[in-house]
UniProtKB/Swiss-Prot annotation:
One of its GO terms (molecular function) is toxin activity. Neurotoxin. Elicits hypersensibility when injected intracranially in mice. May act via potassium channel currents. It comes from the Eukaryota. One of its GO terms (cellular component) is extracellular region. Belongs to the conotoxin I1 superfamily. The keyword 4Fe-4S does not apply. Expressed by the venom duct. The cysteine framework is XI (C-C-CC-CC-C-C). This is Conotoxin Rg11a. It is found in: Secreted.
Amino acid sequence: CQAYGESCSAVVRCCDPNAVCCQYPEDAVCVTRGYCRPPATVLT
C-alpha cells in the first residue's frame, strides 16, 4: 500500500485509514478525504 502523499491508483491502496486515493487531472495521490476537492475525484 502507499503512504500519505504517495501516488496511488484504483488498485494500489493507501495505508492510512484516513486517506483516500485522490485522482487529479494529472496524477493520483493519497490525501485526507477533506483535501480531495473538485475537480479531483476519489478513486474507490
